[in-house]
Amino acid sequence: LCSMPGVVRAQLSVHQFDQLMKKIDDVLWYEKVGDIAHVDKVILCGPPRWKEFNPTSMSAGNELKFRAYIFIPKSVKENKKYPLIVFPHSGVHADMDTYYAHIIRELIAQEYIVVAADYRGSTGYGAGTYNNIDYGGLENEDVYISRNYMVDNFDIVDSSRVGIMGWSHGG
């Protein structure tokens, strides 16, 4: 470990760079889809880590925070229900970024509401989130929690018309 301090510093700077890129990309969502969609980002709570790094710490067993993007067509009417698409991003250590803007635009044009979780292990939130990956386990719970959040908190979501789409790690 003594011979590896440069590696640790490099890893920290990579995560810091990812966080900066995420903040820039968050602004770009408004540029890419803001003309047709209301864009929001919420913090949700998922199950505790699958394995605590320090099981005796005060935070051991606490719920894990993650973020989710919400895209709602600007054309929605309050007295109508709309279908929901749950869209987990692909890539084990990736994130929901504007790479997907063309897909979000198409879904919004068809009057779908979209929720897209940046589940545990996603990039752009620092080493803590990145290292919480469960490789197909608890990330699924995070995605399901984002679905439930939409159904429980948005009266315009039709709970009988909920779909999921994705590919690779998100599919």
Predicted regions: what they are:
Residues G170-G171:
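Catalytic nucleophile loop
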